[in-house]
Every structure is written in C-alpha cells, then in structure tokens.
C-alpha cells in the first residue's frame, strides 16, 4: 500500500540525487485544458485515430486542423496553475536544493500545450541573468508542441502562436465546442509551410510516430532514483513504463493524480487530488528561496 505521508516523502526527496517527473494531461486540467481520457475528455465524441494519426490527417486534413485549432485556442487562453509553477521552481537548482540538496531534475511532459515552458518564464520573470542547466535539460516535451507547425513535404518546423493560425480556421473552435465540425475547408485555406508553401500539419507527435528525445529520456530514467508521476494515468507508452522502470531499478515513485489508476501499482507514495494542490504541498518549496540580487552563477 503506497504511503500518503508527506513527511516520509520529503525524507526520500531530501536524499534523492537524480529526479525525474513524468507529467500528463492532469497537470493542465486545473488550467482548463480538457483531458482526453477522463470522463469529461473531449475525445469522447470523436474517434482519436481519425484525429491524431498521420493517416487521419492524410484522409481529412480539414477535420484534423479544426480540432487542433480548437486545442491551440484553448491553450492560448489558459493560465498556468500552481502545479506548473511548482515544477518550474523545482527545476531551478537553488530552489530545488533547499529540499533536495545536490540533486538533478528533468520534467518529462507528455503535454503539448506549452504551459510548462510558460510557467518557467513566470518563475524567472524579474531575475536578470538567471540561466537553467542544460545537462540534463530541465524540460523535455516528448510529444511535441501544439504551436509547432510542420511542413508535410520539406519537414520545416516553425513556432507559430498566432490566433487564428490562418483565416480559414477562424471561428471554427466554436463549432468544435458544439461538436459540429465543418469538413469542407479547402486544403489551400489550411495552414501552409512558410518555407515552401506546401500543406502544413500540427507539430505534435501522433499515434504511431516516435516521441522526441527517447535516447536521452531512457538515460535519465535509468539513472533516476526518484520519479514523480504527475497527472497521468500511465496508459500511453513509452511514458507509461517509466515509473515501473525506476521502481525496478531500486528508485522510489511518488504519484500525484486526481484518482487511482493502474500506474499506482509501482508507487511508494500516493497523493490523491488535484495536483495543483497536492504537488506544491508535498514538495514544500520555500516561498522566496533567493533574493532578487542573487548571482546568476548560483542558480
């Protein structure tokens, strides 16, 4: 039976040296980003295979782009929540070392909403000259980003946070909310590659495609002695297997989820409830870890 003791968790945290967090849709639920597989998941009305596969895009790029335009608009309107901010703060060595001295940390997120990097900007705002460690990286977005636009022909990738991304999709997010999609938007009116002019696609990792940075992730998972599972039901591989691999290697696993899932079997600690409440409380980070004038080299 997993422990629910914050004191015991903090003792493990204090002694951990190589920490990873594996995050899923539940991390962003409190920000108003709909989850896919929960009871209220927005995919309940649609076939996921028709919306999140290369084959689905080839069959109906208009339908797929309307769906991802809806997700882009939702992400642009969303605010980061306390769990995003806690993980961002924990990524900064000076802050993290107050509760986990001498440790490294990487957040491996399955989310594509861009809220984790936005949270880091919020945490770092006003800190002149602060830099984050590059080895290991503080964040890996293994399933890509909603705001990356990838060419279907030349593979050019470009960050585009414009709203709407193109005039042909303007207002269609309201149709998605009503579960009425218009499949008749001409292909020439969908997003195009700014380099070669060909049809572009959302720059996310679809089912059947290879997630980003797998060799690096495998190395981090193999070294990890503590894995935080945050807002994920541990059903999508390879991420679903990371916690069990850490556990098999002798590391500890702490799960922060709204409700119990199959992934709890590997947990040493289980904190149920919204992770925007449970995670900051469990980490116990100081409110103000350093002065405004702290030298960048110490961070």
Swiss-Prot record:
Positions of NAD(+) binding: 24-43, 110-113, 231-233, 257-259, 275
PROSITE patterns per UniProt: SIRTUIN
Ligand binding (substrate): 68, 71
Alphabetically ordered keywords of this record: Metal-binding, Mitochondrion, NAD, Transferase, Zinc
Keyword Acyltransferase applies: no
Subcellular location: Mitochondrion
Gene Ontology cellular component annotations, sorted alphabetically: mitochondrion; nucleus
Details of cofactor binding: Binds 1 zinc ion per subunit.
Positions of the catalytic residues: 143 (proton acceptor)
Catalytic activities: N(6)-malonyl-L-lysyl-[protein] + NAD(+) + H2O = 2''-O-malonyl-ADP-D-ribose + nicotinamide + L-lysyl-[protein]; N(6)-succinyl-L-lysyl-[protein] + NAD(+) + H2O = 2''-O-succinyl-ADP-D-ribose + nicotinamide + L-lysyl-[protein]; N(6)-glutaryl-L-lysyl-[protein] + NAD(+) + H2O = 2''-O-glutaryl-ADP-D-ribose + nicotinamide + L-lysyl-[protein]
EC number(s) stated in the UniProt entry for this protein: 2.3.1.-
Name of the top EC class for this enzyme: transferase
Cofactor: Zn(2+)
Molecular-function annotations in GO: histone deacetylase activity, NAD-dependent; NAD+ binding; protein-glutaryllysine deglutarylase activity; protein-malonyllysine demalonylase activity; protein-succinyllysine desuccinylase activity; zinc ion binding
Pfam families per the UniProt record, alphabetical: SIR2 (PF02146)
Binding-site residues, Zn(2+): 151, 154, 193, 196
InterPro entries: DHS-like_NAD/FAD-binding_dom, NAD-dep_sirtuin_deacylases, Sirtuin, Sirtuin_cat_small_dom_sf, Sirtuin_class_III, Ssirtuin_cat_dom
Domain Deacetylase sirtuin-type: 1-299
Domains (record comment): In contrast to class I sirtuins, class III sirtuins have only weak deacetylase activity. Difference in substrate specificity is probably due to a larger hydrophobic pocket with 2 residues (Tyr-68 and Arg-71) that bind to malonylated and succinylated substrates and define the specificity.
Function per UniProt: NAD-dependent lysine demalonylase, desuccinylase and deglutarylase that specifically removes malonyl, succinyl and glutaryl groups on target proteins. Has weak NAD-dependent protein deacetylase activity; however this activity may not be physiologically relevant in vivo.
Family assignment from sequence similarity: Belongs to the sirtuin family. Class III subfamily.
Note: This protein may be expected to contain an N-terminal transit peptide but none has been predicted.
PANTHER family: NAD-DEPENDENT PROTEIN DEACYLASE SIRTUIN-5, MITOCHONDRIAL-RELATED
Protein name listed in UniProt: NAD-dependent protein deacylase
């Amino acid at each position: 039976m997993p422990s629910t003791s914050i004191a015991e968790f903090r003792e493990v945290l204090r002694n951990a040296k190589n920490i990873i967090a594996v995050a899923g849709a539940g991390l962003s639920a409190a920000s108003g980003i709909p989850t896919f597989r929960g009871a209220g998941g927005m995919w309940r009305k649609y076939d996921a295979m028709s919306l999140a596969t290369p084959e689905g895009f080839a069959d109906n790029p208009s339908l797929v782009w309307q769906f991802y335009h809806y997700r882009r608009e939702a992400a642009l309107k969303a605010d980061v929540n306390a769990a995003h901010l806690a993980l961002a703060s924990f990524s900064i060595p000076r802050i993290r070392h107050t509760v986990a001295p001498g440790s490294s940390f990487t957040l491996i997120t399955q989310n594509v909403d861009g809220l984790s990097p936005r949270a880091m900007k919020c945490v770092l705002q006003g800190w002149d000259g602060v830099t984050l460690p590059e080895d290991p990286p503080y964040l890996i977005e293994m399933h890509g980003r909603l705001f990356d636009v990838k060419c279907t022909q030349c593979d050019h990738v470009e960050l585009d946070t414009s709203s709407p991304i193109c005039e042909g999709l303007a207002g269609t997010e309201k149709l998605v909310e009503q579960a009425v999609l218009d499949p008749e938007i001409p292909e020439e009116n969908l997003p195009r590659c700014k380099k070669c002019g060909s049809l572009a696609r959302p720059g996310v990792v679809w089912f059947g495609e290879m997630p980003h940075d797998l060799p690096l992730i495998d190395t981090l998972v193999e070294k990890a002695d503590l894995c935080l599972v945050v807002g994920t039901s541990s059903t999508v591989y390879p991420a679903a297997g990371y916690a069990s691999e850490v556990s098999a290697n002798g590391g500890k696993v702490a799960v922060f989820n709204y409700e119990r899932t199959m992934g709890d079997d590997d947990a040493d600690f289980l904190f149920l409830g919204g992770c925007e409440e449970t995670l900051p409380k469990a980490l116990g980070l100081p409110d103000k870890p350093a002065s405004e004038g702290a030298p960048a080299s110490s961070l």
